[in-house]
């Protein structure tokens, strides 16, 4: 039995499909999306970013239980989303200050959990870069930061989705074999830390615990893990989390993300859905940049739709309802916020 306040419960239900699975689309990228569109189009224009997000939202949210957006470029996309699609809203500033050690997080100054809720948001999402092996003087800042967000979300009774992105302060290439060997332990440490009640997190938005480019049978070159080792890392992460968790696509291709979710399904991992971003829509950027709105719309109605609906099928096969970590739906006791 778990007690959950009505605002948080209602938010989680609005973000989930009829099976209680969070089959969500992510397009809250800001700086990186601006760069990608600029490279494809040759010009930089805020409206291009807004229009791209709006078209993605319009065409793909009929196949998503929810969409993750930002209020900097995403307002037209929020308005364009399908009626039945829930809304997660980003609260953190994009990127981090590279001149300061520790990749410290920061919030958008004119935003709050209350304002996100007033704007129709069903959940607050925060991304934080996290190296569990960095000095305490860096990590304590992040811990206190997240405690404040958790308290804010509790106060206005809105779900808190936390996305910890792990890194290593000394191994700076996150795509390297060296980092691939470190990654499982980093992801496990982040789950252990941020599942603590003090943070008030409702759903963890997690990286998969291995880099599939280095998994035996998937790797084209060097191998960091056998398939059995990779499966063990998935299972251990699943068992470690007392909270519902979903997977993020982390910039991999649609094909690779599908293989990743198939792998999780094969090993009975208790994940409750995905927040899939670039794996779904990134190939549409080149189409948009070179051929414009109508060509992108056509791409979204064909390849984009195929990317998201084939992922939905995989979720049907393996994802579990968000309340599974608490037992059955009947074990969730909804209470009014005091």
From Swiss-Prot:
InterPro entries: Aldolase_TIM, DeoC/FbaB/LacD_aldolase, LacD_aldolase, Tag_1.6-dipho_adolase. Keywords: Lactose metabolism, Lyase. Pfam families: DeoC (PF01791). Its EC number is 4.1.2.40. It is an enzyme of class 4 (lyase). It comes from the Bacteria. GO terms for molecular function: 6-deoxy-6-sulfofructose-1-phosphate aldolase activity; tagatose-6-phosphate kinase activity; tagatose-bisphosphate aldolase activity. The keyword Chloroplast does not apply. GO terms for biological process: 6-sulfoquinovose(1-) catabolic process; D-tagatose 6-phosphate catabolic process; lactose catabolic process via tagatose-6-phosphate. Transmembrane segments: none annotated. It catalyses: D-tagatofuranose 1,6-bisphosphate = D-glyceraldehyde 3-phosphate + dihydroxyacetone phosphate. SMART domains: DeoC. Pathway: Carbohydrate metabolism; D-tagatose 6-phosphate degradation; D-glyceraldehyde 3-phosphate and glycerone phosphate from D-tagatose 6-phosphate: step 2/2. Belongs to the aldolase LacD family. This is Tagatose 1,6-diphosphate aldolase.
């Amino acid at each position: 039995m778990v007690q959950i306040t009505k605002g948080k419960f209602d938010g989680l239900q609005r973000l989930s499909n009829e099976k209680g699975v969070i089959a969500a689309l992510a397009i809250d990228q800001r700086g990186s999306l601006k760069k990608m569109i600029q490279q494809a189009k040759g010009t930089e224009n805020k409206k291009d970013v807004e229009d791209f997000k709006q078209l993605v939202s319009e065409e793909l949210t009929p196949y998503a239980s929810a969409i993750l957006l930002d209020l900097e470029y995403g307002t037209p996309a929020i308005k364009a989303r399908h009626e039945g699609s829930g809304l997660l809203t980003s609260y953190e500033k994009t990127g981090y200050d590279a001149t300061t050690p520790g990749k410290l997080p920061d919030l958008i100054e004119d935003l709050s959990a209350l304002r996100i809720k007033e704007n129709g948001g069903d959940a607050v999402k925060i991304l934080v870069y996290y190296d569990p092996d960095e000095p305490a003087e860096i990590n304590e800042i992040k811990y206190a930061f997240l405690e404040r967000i958790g308290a804010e979300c509790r106060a206005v009774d809105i779900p808190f989705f936390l996305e910890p992105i792990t890194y290593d302060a000394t191994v700076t290439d996150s795509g390297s074999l060296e980092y691939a060997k470190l990654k499982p332990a980093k992801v496990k440490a982040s789950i252990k830390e941020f599942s603590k009640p003090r943070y008030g997190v409702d759903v963890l938005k997690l990286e998969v615990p291995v880099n599939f480019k280095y998994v035996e049978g998937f790797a084209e070159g060097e191998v960091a893990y056998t398939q059995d080792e990779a499966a063990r890392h998935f299972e251990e992460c699943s068992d470690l989390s007392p909270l519902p968790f979903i997977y993020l696509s982390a910039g991999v291709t649609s094909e690779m993300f599908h293989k990743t979710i198939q792998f999780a399904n094969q090993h009975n991992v208790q994940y409750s859905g995905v927040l899939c971003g670039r794996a779904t829509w990134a190939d549409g950027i080149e189409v948009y940049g070179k051929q414009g709105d109508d060509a992108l719309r056509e791409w979204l109605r064909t390849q984009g739709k195929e990317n998201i609906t084939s992922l939905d099928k995989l979720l049907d096969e393996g994802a579990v309802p968000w309340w599974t970590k608490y037992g059955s739906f009947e074990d969730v006791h909804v209470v009014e916020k005091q």
